[in-house]
């Protein structure tokens, strides 16, 4: 009853009245009829869809497909030059995802019995070099991990499990030769037999190889289920036992190596029939023997990314069901934005927007299928995502795996250097109890606010997330008004330390006494003078470049000085009293001013 009441409340807030009434009546439409559903209109939404602040912790993910180069790569690496072109394309993709504040990339790593890294178990996939079995001349997985981590993103190795490609393709042939009678043929394709114990053992080997060799943030299992056309000759419960055995073998293998690596999978989008909302025969638990909610309960999975490529009553009650059965773990609905392409479906962007709002309200986040349709800005989905993700976010911490807090950063220092504001600190690779942090990196989160001390629980103050290294440079235009800073450390489980704030004495020194770190407000025509100016016997104001050359002299016009003659750029402002003593008032950045 609780679930139904919550759903009806949300449905009434999201859908037009006629749609809500249809949901209440229990007359669910078929999937095919959804194309005729009227688009959701913003003015019809309740407060659940407005005044939402982007949360500090939220998974914002994308599936990045490599099979056939669908998302990447779009060219082959057959020489050092073409390999570099391929790498540059990935960097451009990641740059655009970073701008949209996406924090998790699920990269297809095992494609169809083939790999995008030099594996001792399976051959190269042909998506990189153009030739199955041939190296592109570099390790694509390692490159992607490095580039994601540079941008503060998590990289999860997406492993396609049961399907192994066309019967006569390289990956399938290799496995048929290696494991006689393990591969079953359905139509033109080969599949690993879920009921053969060798399947789970071998997939655990693959995931162990990836986990051991690479600094991945997660293993993401795809198609860990029975094929829909499989002739199931055992009971549904026995079928679930077989699939769960595979999941257990993989999970135990990964966690024995690196317990901070997130185990996840992408189950079918509806777990099972609900009391008032049927799945119409396509669900995880009954149809394909995928007990994904049980895997969360039993600790075999840290996260689920259910493929919820549906709308309206086919989406909302099932999203709530996933959230209610999350067992304190991470559940991230996969959104079918590929249907925004008229070649793929007849969706309107207003089918997706309320789904994003609802999953945010439920604390779930979202995952886009797939990258191409996001970055192609299909129906403006990328533009909306940029607005929706106003601030960076952190992936929720794995509190069920570790609660130890890293030690705070120390020696926080803020100063101007070569035209940039430099924020630096030092890390300690240990927890507060003195034990060593086992994860490969210590990450850092930088916060900034116009009030002191900085509230690190406020998502609006997070300016750099999951940062490697111990320094951040800000351009003058990024800190035009006075800012105060704080830094936290974070381990691979996502657990944050307490915040290290600027010392109060340093704040007073930098903002008031010495003054050079104070950012002065400039509207392009005038610089507003700080309060401290009232206490100075100022005769004239000097404007210098950051290199120390005086370029302008002015007198005040009340509480500001006119700087229209100055060229755009960064400058320091000084007051000079009648005795010739200079006082640093602060730094300002003049943008190009446009007359109305």
Language model feature labels by segment:
Residues 56-59, 63-88, 156-213:
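Active-site-adjacent "subsite" loops/lids of carbohydrate-active enzymes
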Residues 88-114, 214-216:
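Catalytic domains of carbohydrate-active enzymes, especially glycoside hydrolases
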Residues 154-166, 220, 239-285, 331-340:
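Aromatic-lined carbohydrate-recognition surfaces of secreted/lumenal glycan-active proteins
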Residues 292-293, 297-315, 332-402:
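Substrate-binding cleft of secreted/luminal carbohydrate-active enzymes
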Residues 383-436, 494-517:
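Pro/Thr/Ser/Gly-rich low-complexity, intrinsically disordered linker/stalk tracts
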Residues 474-496, 573-575:
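Beta-strand-rich modules
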Residues 479, 555-579:
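Short, surface-exposed loop/turn motifs with a glycine/proline- and acidic-biased composition
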Residues 510-514, 528-530, 568-596:
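C-terminal tail/sorting-segment detector
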């Amino acid at each position: 009853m609780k679930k139904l009441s919550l759903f009806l409340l949300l449905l009434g807030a999201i859908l037009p009245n006629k749609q809500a009434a249809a949901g209440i009546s229990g007359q669910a439409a078929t999937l095919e009829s959804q194309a005729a559903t009227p688009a959701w209109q913003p003015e019809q939404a309740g407060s659940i869809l407005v005044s939402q602040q982007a949360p500090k912790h939220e998974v914002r993910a994308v599936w990045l497909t490599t099979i056939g180069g669908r998302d990447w790569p779009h060219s082959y690496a057959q020489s050092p030059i073409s390999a570099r072109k391929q790498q540059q394309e990935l960097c451009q993709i990641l740059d655009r995802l970073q701008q949209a504040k996406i924090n998790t990339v699920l990269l297809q790593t095992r494609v169809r019995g083939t790999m995008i890294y030099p594996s001792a178990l399976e051959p190269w996939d042909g998506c990189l070099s153009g030739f199955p079995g041939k190296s592109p001349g570099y390790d694509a997985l390692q490159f992607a991990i490095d580039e994601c981590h540079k941008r503060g993103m998590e990289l999860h190795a997406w492993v396609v499990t049961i399907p192994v490609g066309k019967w006569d393709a390289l990956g399938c042939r290799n496995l048929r030769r290696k494991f006689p009678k393990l591969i079953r043929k359905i139509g033109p394709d080969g599949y690993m037999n879920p009921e053969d114990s060798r399947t789970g053992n071998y997939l655990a080997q693959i995931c162990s190889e990836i986990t051991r060799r690479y600094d991945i943030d997660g293993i993401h299992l795809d198609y860990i289920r029975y094929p829909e056309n499989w002739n199931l000759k055992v009971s549904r419960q026995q079928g679930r036992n077989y699939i769960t055995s595979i999941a257990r073998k993989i999970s135990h293998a990964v966690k024995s190596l690196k317990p901070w690596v997130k185990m996840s999978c992408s189950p079918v989008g509806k777990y099972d029939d609900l009391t008032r909302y049927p799945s119409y025969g396509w669900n995880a638990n009954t149809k394909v023997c995928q007990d994904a909610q049980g895997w969360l309960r039993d600790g075999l999975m840290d996260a689920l990314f259910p493929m919820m490529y549906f709308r309206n009553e086919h989406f909302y009650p099932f999203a709530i069901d996933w959230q209610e059965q999350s067992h304190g773990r991470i559940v991230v609905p996969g959104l079918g934005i590929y249907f925004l392409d008229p070649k793929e479906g007849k969706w309107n962007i207003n089918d997706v927007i309320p789904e994003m709002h609802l999953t945010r309200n439920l604390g779930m986040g979202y995952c886009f299928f797939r990258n191409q349709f996001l970055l192609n800005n299909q129906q403006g989905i990328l533009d909306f995502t940029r607005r929706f993700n106003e601030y960076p976010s952190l992936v929720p911490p794995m509190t069920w795996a570790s609660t130890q807090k890293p030690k705070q950063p120390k020696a926080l220092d803020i100063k101007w250097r070569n035209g940039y504001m430099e924020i630096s600190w030092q890390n300690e690779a240990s927890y507060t109890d003195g034990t060593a942090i086992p994860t490969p990196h210590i990450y850092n989160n930088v916060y900034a606010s116009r009030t002191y001390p900085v509230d690190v629980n406020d998502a609006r103050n997070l300016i750099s997330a999951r940062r490697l290294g111990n320094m951040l440079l800000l351009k003058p235009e990024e800190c035009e008004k006075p800012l105060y800073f704080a830094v936290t450390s974070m381990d691979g489980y996502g657990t944050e330390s307490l915040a290290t704030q600027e010392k109060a004495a340093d704040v007073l020194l930098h903002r008031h006494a010495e003054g050079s770190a104070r950012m002065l407000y400039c509207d392009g025509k005038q610089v507003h003078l700080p309060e401290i100016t009232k206490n100075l016997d100022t005769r004239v104001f000097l404007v210098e470049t950051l290199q120390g050359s005086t370029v302008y002299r002015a007198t005040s016009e009340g509480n500001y000085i006119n700087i229209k003659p100055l060229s755009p750029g960064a400058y320091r402002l000084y007051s000079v009293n009648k005795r010739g003593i200079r006082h640093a008032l602060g730094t300002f950045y003049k943008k190009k001013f446009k007359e109305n």
